């Protein structure tokens, strides 16, 4: 848990890290809380592997089109895909697997970068924004 302690054991508490500090890690968890995993966009733009559950929230980033094992490393929401349920063991197993198979890790990172690239075209994003506004005004009778 990062930030304020809301009844969690003290050993779970950590000081908040900056994005720059996170980028020192090979694996970064991108977990949904009450909404999307807000760090997913910058994690997928980094050279770290995004580790996450299958996304359930959808935004302009089209999280529902992401493919597990291709754009990110998937874990089950309750970690039941592992013999032991502690997150430490999950991370250890993932770490060992992708350290032993760096080409697979690099492929996932490359695919994540390719996915993010589609949102980095300013002209295209501006055109899409105008098209959304046009459709909104037409459907709401304001055109």
Predicted feature locations:
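Catalytic donor nucleotide-activated moiety binding site of glycosyltransferases and closely related
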Residues: 1-16, 61
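Catalytic binding pocket for nucleotide-activated donors in carbohydrate/polymer assembly enzymes
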Residues: 16-143
């Amino acid at each position: 848990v990062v930030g304020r302690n809301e009844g969690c054991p003290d050993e779970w508490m950590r000081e908040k890290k900056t994005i720059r500090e996170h980028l020192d890690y090979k694996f970064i968890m991108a977990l949904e809380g009450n909404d999307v995993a807000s760090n997913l966009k910058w994690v997928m733009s980094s050279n770290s592997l995004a580790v996450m559950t299958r996304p359930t929230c959808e935004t302009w980033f089209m999280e529902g089109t992401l493919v597990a094992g291709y754009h990110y490393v998937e874990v089950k929401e309750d970690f039941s895909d592992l013999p032991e349920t502690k997150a430490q063991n999950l991370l250890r197993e993932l770490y060992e697997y992708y350290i032993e198979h760096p080409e697979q890790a690099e492929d996932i990172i490359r695919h994540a970068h390719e996915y993010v690239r589609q949102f980095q075209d300013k002209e295209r994003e501006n055109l899409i924004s105008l098209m959304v506004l046009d459709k909104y005004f037409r459907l709401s009778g304001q055109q």
